[in-house]
């Protein structure tokens, strides 16, 4: 994942925060424009990430989530009706390329179990925090988006050992649960396809092998003074 640090710095850290906000991560979730923001250094709720991935599934249209759809009175009169508030926040071609990239994670990446079990177009991303203290899988199909998270009440405790696994990651239980939910949810639905990738900027690979992030000179510690030599001159 370290490649995303120089990539994020090249794209612009403020832009990363802006994209997250537009996708659906609310202002109540603290996000600081530092290099670690590219690695997920924030603490959103599960519904926040499900909402963000729903924006990707809807080809860049963000809809504000709501939990209560309808409230009926004693005479079955509708007292409250939830309304979809939607706005296009990303270009469709950008979302097509994003989906193409994320679909690789569910076919041959860390969440390959998703593609194998759902057996229809899927896209998503696993996430595992330091010391395996939390594990996530967020993903979508053309029809639905969902998020599954594992963590303990004490965020400092590791998940390792749960279910007999020595290492609990986003590609283990979270991905499996997500796959079973989506498989059941879409059991009788016709298979839909994602839009083809737009290949914005071309298809030539870009190398970051020799890319070194620039650091603020004020943060660079001074070089140590050379040790005095005890050798005698001849």
Model regions: which residues?
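A penicillin-recognizing enzyme superfamily signal
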Residues: 43-207, 214-221
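Active-site-adjacent helix/loop patches that line small-molecule binding or acyl-intermediate pockets
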Residues: 1-25, 31-58, 104
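Long, low-complexity, intrinsically disordered segments
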Residues: 222-234
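Active-site-adjacent bridging/hinge elements
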Residues: 17-31, 117, 149-157
């Amino acid at each position: 994942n370290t490649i995303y640090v120089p990539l994020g710095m090249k794209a612009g850290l403020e832009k990363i925060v802006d994209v997250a906000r537009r996708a659906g991560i609310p202002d109540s979730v603290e996000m600081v424009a530092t290099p670690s923001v590219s690695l997920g250094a924030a603490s959103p709720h599960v519904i926040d990430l499900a909402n963000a991935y729903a924006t990707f599934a809807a080809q860049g249209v963000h809809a504000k989530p709501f939990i209560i759809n309808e409230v009926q009175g004693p005479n079955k009169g509708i007292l409250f009706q939830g309304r979809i508030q939607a706005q296009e926040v990303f270009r469709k071609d950008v979302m097509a390329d994003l989906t193409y990239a994320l679909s690789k994670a569910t076919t041959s990446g860390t969440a390959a179990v998703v593609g194998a079990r759902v057996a229809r177009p899927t896209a998503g991303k696993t996430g595992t925090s330091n010391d395996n203290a939390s594990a996530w899988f967020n993903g979508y199909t053309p029809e639905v988006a969902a998020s599954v998270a594992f963590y303990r009440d004490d965020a400092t405790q590791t998940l390792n050992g749960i279910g007999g696994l020595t290492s609990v990651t986003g590609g283990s239980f979270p991905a499996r649960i997500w796959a079973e939910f989506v498989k059941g949810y879409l059991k009788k639905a016709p298979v839909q396809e994602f839009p083809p990738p737009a290949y914005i900027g071309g298809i030539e690979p870009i190398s970051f092998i020799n890319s070194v992030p620039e650091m603020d000179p004020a943060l660079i510690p001074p070089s140590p003074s050379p040790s005095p030599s005890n050798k005698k001159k001849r």
